[in-house]
Structure formats: C-alpha cells, structure tokens
C-alpha cells in the first residue's frame, strides 16, 4: 500500500471540502484528536469542518509539506493556510500523525496546531 499517495489523497479531500472522499479513506470507527480537544469520530469532525470552513466559504491550502512514511504510520508537518473570500487569511504550522490498518485505511488521526492563529479568521 502506498501510504504517501493515500496521505496526499486525504489532504486533497480536506482542501476540496470532500467529506465523502475523506470517509472513503478511513476505516470504520476511525478516531480523530486535535490538540487537547476531545477525541471524535469522523462524522463529528466533518460536521465541524462543514460548519466552520466548508459552508462558510473558507478555502484550505497546504504548503511546506514535510512527511515521514513508516510501517502503517505517516507523520506530516505542513503549513495550513485558511482564506476567506474577502482575502483575509491565517496560517499555522501543523503536525499530523496518521495511522493506517493493513488495507491502507486510516484508523486514527492526531493533529497538533496553534488554534489561536485561526481565531481572527473564524470570528
């Protein structure tokens, strides 16, 4: 299984506001944890993204990608930039650890970023 390509696909789906595409890459029961927030399921994550970003017209872009692929795990550092239609944008460094099962489906995502960097954008 090509975890590098599957990780590319995951972030492409997030950037395209494609909840179905994200779901297709994930195993049943996938768990997601961001910073010190409670662990959530995929439905809760995508509902939050839809409310805060996707339905609000906030675009997501990834840059400066640094990725390490190991056995059933990918660790990626990148800069994520969120941009509103009025041109206002905010960026933060992010570290994401993605775990995969034997079929290459995502079983867990742990993501760490400075959420305060996005406060002015989302208020």
Language model features with spans:
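Short, low-complexity N-terminal intrinsically disordered segments enriched in polar/charged residues
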Residues: 1-24, 28, 123
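Hydrophobic pocket/interface hotspot
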Residues: 10, 21-22, 30, 45, ...
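A solvent-exposed, acidic/Ser-Thr-rich amphipathic alpha-helical stretch
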Residues: 19-23, 27-72
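Short, cysteine-centered beta-strand-loop-beta hairpins and adjacent loop/turn segments enriched
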Residues: 54-57, 82-91
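Short, surface-exposed coil-to-beta transition loops
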Residues: 60-63, 90-95
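A short hydrophobic beta-strand element
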Residues: 70-81
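Short beta-strand edge/turn micro-motifs at domain boundaries
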Residues: 93-120
